[in-house]
A protein has these predicted regions:
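N-terminal secretory signal peptides that target proteins for export/translocation
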Residues: 1-2
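Bacterial N-terminal signal peptides
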Residues: 7-18
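Bacterial Sec signal peptide processing site at the extreme N-terminus
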Residues: 17-38
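Exported/periplasmic cell-wall-interacting domains
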Residues: 19, 24-26, 79-86, 105-190
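N-terminal post-signal-peptidase region of extra-cytosolic proteins
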Residues: 34-51, 56-57, 71-90, 102, ...
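A short, compositionally biased
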Residues: 54-60, 134-136
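Solvent-exposed coil/turn segments that connect beta secondary-structure elements
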Residues: 57-59, 66-69, 78-80, 94-97, ...
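Short acidic, Gly/Pro-enriched loop/turn segments at secondary-structure junctions
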Residues: 98-105
Length: 190
């Protein structure tokens, strides 16, 4: 009887110790990027078609390849009066070195800027000056009304700044341009 009690007690001790073991650690939480980080891009090893989701509230793009998260980027979308429209789009055209046909700056005869945020429909350059159309490098057209994604300044990350386009950090635009194709889906949400 004593042996049975010992065996039962030993079994109970093993059972209790087994249940009291430390549970597995939860998966690590994503580490927020260092301040000033404008994008993260990790497409290596991912296979499949790209897709992009742009959130107008957070001014951030999420990029997927084959349904797997490949990276994110801050963006600058349309400022008040030039609001970027939510909806489902596809990339219609890709041009490495594109310039706006409406917006830019006026300069005098010496090349000094007279008006920095000029509209060619209403802002004429001074005599001897000219209109310099804004560069939109790595242009990825979303509409035939002049809206697309391209490299450009992000003056205040998290805030709107453009005339309706989706600006990407200048360093990131060529990397994204390389991965997308005509027909890549782009969803813009509020």
């Amino acid at each position: 009887l004593w042996g049975w009690r010992f065996a039962a007690g030993g079994f109970l001790a093993v059972l209790v110790l087994g249940c009291a073991s430390t549970p597995p650690a939860p998966p690590p939480q994503p580490v927020p990027p260092p301040p000033g980080t404008l994008y993260e891009w990790n497409p290596d090893g991912l296979i499949g078609e790209p897709s992009i989701i742009i959130d107008l509230r957070t001014q951030r793009a999420e990029i997927y390849i084959g349904g797997e998260h490949a990276g994110w980027s801050v963006v600058a979308t349309g400022k008040e009066g030039f609001n970027t429209q939510a909806g489902d789009y596809t990339i219609l055209e890709k041009v490495v070195d594109k310039r706006s046909t409406l917006y830019g700056r006026t300069v005098d005869a010496y090349g000094s800027t007279v008006k920095a945020d000029a509209d060619a429909r209403r802002d004429s350059p001074p005599e001897g000056g000219r209109f310099v159309f804004a560069p939109m490098p790595y242009w990825m057209r979303l509409t035939w009304r002049g809206i697309g994604m391209h490299g450009g300044p992000i003056p205040r990350p998290g805030r709107t700044a453009s005339h309706g386009c989706i600006r990407l950090p200048r360093e990131f635009a060529p990397q994204l341009f390389e991965y997308v194709r005509i027909g890549t889906p782009v969803r813009i949400i509020r």
